[in-house]
Amino acid sequence: AINRGILIDRNLKTSHAGVYACGDMAEGYDFLLKINRLLPIWPAAYIGGRTAGFNMAGQNTEYDGATVMNALNYFSFPLVAAGLVNLEKEEGYEVMTSLKSSMYRKIVLKDNRIVGLLYTGVVDRAGIVYGLMKDGIDVSAFKGELISPSFGMASMPEALRKERMKLIVNSHEKEKALQRA
């Protein structure tokens, strides 16, 4: 079945038995909006392709989803954006910004959860913030640190930091196990 793209479930199956779809032509799961929609970006296609491949090979694997994002260097000026970043006037959203020298950071929150990020100039650790956004982590205990140039894993409460590190280790172990299978 199709809408704006091929309709798929969280295992990337289509409405036809044995047929899977992902990438630019499929309506993948957007973890922020909690809906399936077109997400024509390379990371979503790559992860979707791996997930579809595992499912076609009999390894039941659920697609975690993606959201809109982009990273680029414009005349040696790096920029990373992900999620919902143009919501200044929307009710219920909190926007935090920081402008220092050649670095700009913007974090958009809803209910103490990150729903958007925009980094320019110095984009270090944007991946940490993206991970917090993807996993829907409540950042109320350290949200004031999010736009700091020194923000990193050490800025998080110890229990959360240990949990995040454990997730990273488990993810690498799962990846190795899937490659061996």
Give names to the regions the model predicted.
Residues 1-51, 138-147:
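FAD-site-proximal beta/loop scaffold in flavoenzymes
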Residues 123-140:
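A short, polar/charged loop-to-alpha-helix boundary motif
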Residues 25-127, 176-181:
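Mid-to-C-terminal Rossmann-like scaffold of FAD/NAD(P)H-dependent oxidoreductases
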Residues 58-59, 135-137, 149:
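Short loop/turn hinge sites at secondary-structure boundaries
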Residues 139-181:
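Cysteine/selenocysteine-centered motifs that mediate thiol-based redox chemistry or coordinate metal-sulfur cofactors
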Residues 3-12, 84-87, 163-164, 172-175:
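Short, mixed-charge, low-aromatic patches
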Residues 33-34, 111, 132-135, 158:
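Short, charged/polar low-complexity linear motifs in solvent-exposed/disordered segments
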